[in-house]
């Protein structure tokens, strides 16, 4: 004897099963992230979800709203459904803009991108929305020069462990001398600590400033005093380094001078120094910018410049002969982070190589005379060669940006994971640090995007807490001279950057300045998008819940078993896919580690809407509410939200990522849309 179920029983059982399956589908992406290549699978799933949202919005929500509003369309001769779709699209857009205006203000961009490098003449950083050091920069200003500064640095040697380094500095006019230092597997613990300096020590800063070897105080006395004054007013931070045991292998030509320059002494961390970032021209960029105002983080200066300006090809050949110094990566992984006045510790297992230890010493000469010897080089800077880290790198042709605001209780981080994983090769930039910035995010890959040996380091020290922009990968044809009126062709330097392609494991030559304008605009968009995506899951829940509520309502008002089953099939097919898409969007919309509680609550609310709608439908049957304009209007608005999420948030982002998966993602996008097209047959 068969079991006889009433319409009410069918509704209760179906809504219960629908709730459970929808909840499971929504939280499934949380465990998907632990799979191998999880980011790739999540990206595929998100593309599929984009097709689902697009199909659901246009073929289901909009079609239903248009059908229900036809009597009013005919009566008033007006496309109400299309109006509702546009309203929903614009509401979602304006809601994101409002959130952006609250959380991403103009001074945030200025803090992230900082001032233009106004001392680097004819550079992209100077010409692209550049600002003077006294005012905030617009988005994009201060970015595009592959340089940075060590910041206010106090590097102290630990008494128990010290590096064994034999740096040499050739005299003026000699050939380049190379000193290579290789780090052994350090059994000794290594930590890097950033902490505030006592205020009563600031008065000693003036006595500790290092003056570069090639600095001519007589010619630039006023500039020097001005920079000293600014430096003295700046709140400095200490850089305290306990270095593991190193072994050194030196392969160098005979040098006519064994004198170690102040620059080299700073680089090999053999003594304690304060470093004024404005004094050295073209010294290495740093992976930690600890100056309060900060000049950003760039790459490593290493271009052996031949000043024979009559033959640029010879200059290129000289640069290519010294390209090994660009094939380096640094990986930093903090293990603890606190809030304001924080102290950050970095374990030796993650930071295997210190950026100020392994160096390539070049000629520290200010001789700008022409040279006919293409094998020799006259550099105005020391440069660094960091032994490549043996850990697997995330990328070597991409970079990321982050910001730390010391006034916040918790660090505010912007990490362009999209930019790291999916930027096309050759679009690299340095990392940008904001005011009071410390390296504190989970994992950082710094790319050597060197400026060569030209240009001052960053912008001047200033007290308006505007961080510098950081690098973007070299520059081409930059005229540099401390005295703007005396710029001449002897100072013109053409530098090249080597970008390592992790896919083909090949090295690409590229003019650093050539791609910067295009990338700056992309950077600006990325920052806005990543912030606004924080709101995306909540927008989706609202839109999905409205739709799901009326789906349940439609099922609740039915009195025929056949009609209940027809609607139930459509709801099952759509809601499970939509719930999975919601989970994917929640996981991929945030830069932070996904919270299971947040995901569960969002999916739970969405899963609960269909049963609630079904109960409401059964309660208000015959009340006349379901025949009003309210349900189709809300459905039309929800269709606009779905359209926005699909064509603005999901599809462009996913299809612009990894080009190797473009065919797979296109297929998944069409599959998601086709699935909703099939579901629409029963709706």
UniProtKB/Swiss-Prot annotation:
* One example of a Gene Ontology biological process annotation: zinc ion transmembrane transport
- Compositional bias per record (Basic residues), positions renumbered to this chain: 120-129
Report keywords, A-Z. Answer: Ion transport, Membrane, Metal-binding, Transmembrane, Transmembrane helix, Transport
- Region of interest (Disordered), ranges: 120-180, 299-325, 364-390, 451-489
One cellular component (GO) term of this entry? plasma membrane
Cellular localisation:
Membrane
Q: Which GO terms describe its molecular function?
A: metal ion binding; zinc ion transmembrane transporter activity
Q: What is this protein called?
A: Protein zntD
């Amino acid at each position: 004897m068969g079991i006889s179920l009433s319409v009410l029983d069918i509704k209760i059982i179906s809504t219960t099963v629908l709730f459970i399956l929808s909840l499971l589908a929504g939280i499934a992406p949380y465990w998907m992230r632990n799979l191998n290549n999880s980011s790739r699978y999540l990206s595929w799933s998100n593309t599929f979800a984009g097709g689902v949202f697009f199909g659901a919005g246009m073929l289901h929500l909009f079609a239903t709203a248009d059908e229900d509003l036809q009597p009013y369309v005919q009566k008033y001769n007006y496309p109400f459904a299309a109006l509702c779709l546009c309203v929903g699209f614009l509401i979602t857009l304006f809601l994101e803009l409002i959130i952006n205006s609250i959380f991403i203000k103009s001074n945030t961009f200025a803090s992230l991108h900082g001032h233009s490098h106004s001392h680097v003449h004819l550079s992209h950083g100077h010409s692209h929305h550049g600002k003077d050091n006294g005012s905030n920069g617009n988005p994009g200003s201060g970015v595009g020069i592959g340089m940075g500064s060590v910041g206010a640095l106090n590097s102290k040697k630990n008494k128990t462990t010290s590096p064994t380094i034999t740096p040499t500095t050739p005299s003026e006019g000699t050939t380049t001398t190379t000193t290579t230092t290789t780090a052994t597997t350090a059994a000794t613990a290594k930590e890097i600590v950033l902490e505030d300096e006592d205020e009563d020590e600031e008065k000693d800063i003036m006595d500790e400033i290092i003056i570069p070897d090639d600095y001519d105080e007589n010619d630039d006395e006023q500039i020097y005093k001005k920079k000293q004054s600014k430096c003295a007013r700046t709140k400095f931070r200490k850089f305290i380094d306990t270095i593991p045991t190193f072994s050194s292998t030196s392969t160098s030509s005979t040098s006519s001078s064994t004198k170690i320059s102040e620059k080299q002494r700073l680089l090999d961390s053999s003594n304690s120094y304060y470093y004024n970032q404005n004094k050295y021209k073209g010294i290495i960029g740093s992976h930690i910018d600890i100056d309060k105002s900060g000049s950003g983080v760039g790459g490593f200066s290493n271009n052996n410049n031949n000043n024979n300006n009559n033959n640029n090809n010879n200059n290129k050949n000289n640069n290519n002969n010294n390209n090994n110094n660009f094939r380096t990566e640094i990986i930093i992984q903090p293990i603890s982070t606190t809030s304001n006045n924080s102290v950050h510790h970095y374990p030796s297992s993650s930071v295997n190589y210190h950026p100020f230890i392994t160096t390539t010493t070049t000629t520290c000469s200010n001789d700008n005379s022409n040279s006919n010897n293409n094998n020799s080089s006259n550099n105005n800077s020391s440069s660094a060669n960091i032994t490549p880290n043996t850990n697997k790198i995330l990328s070597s042709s991409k970079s990321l940006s982050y910001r730390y605001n010391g006034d916040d209780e918790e660090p505010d981080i912007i990490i362009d994971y999209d930019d790291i994983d999916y930027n096309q090769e050759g679009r690299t930039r340095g990392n940008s640090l904001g005011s009071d910035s410390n390296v504190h995010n989970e994992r950082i890959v710094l790319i050597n995007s060197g400026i060569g040996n030209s240009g001052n380091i960053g912008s001047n020290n200033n007290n308006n807490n505007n961080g510098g922009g950081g690098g973007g990968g070299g520059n081409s044809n930059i005229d540099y001279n401390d005295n703007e009126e005396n710029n001449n062709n002897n100072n013109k330097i053409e530098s090249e950057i080597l970008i390592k392609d992790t896919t083909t494991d090949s090295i690409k030559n590229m003019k650093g300045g050539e791609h910067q304008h295009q990338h700056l605009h992309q950077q600006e968009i990325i920052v806005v998008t990543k912030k606004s995506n924080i709101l995306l899951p909540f927008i989706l829940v609202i839109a999905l819940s409205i739709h799901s509520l009326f789906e349940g309502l439609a099922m609740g008002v039915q009195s025929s078993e056949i009609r209940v089953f027809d609607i139930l099939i459509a709801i099952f097919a759509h809601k499970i896919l939509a719930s999975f898409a919601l989970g994917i969007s929640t996981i991929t919309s945030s830069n932070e580690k996904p919270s299971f509680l947040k995901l569960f609550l969002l999916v739970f609310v969405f899963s609960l809407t269909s049963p609630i709608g079904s109960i409401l439908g059964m309660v208000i049957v015959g009340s006349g509410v379901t025949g009003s304009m309210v349900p189709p209007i809300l459905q039309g608005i929800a269709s606009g939200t779905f359209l926005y999420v699909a064509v603005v948030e999901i599809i462009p982002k996913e299809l612009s990522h990894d080009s190797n998966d473009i065919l797979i993602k296109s297929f998944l996008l069409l599959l998601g849309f086709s699935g909703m097209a099939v579901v629409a047959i029963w709706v």
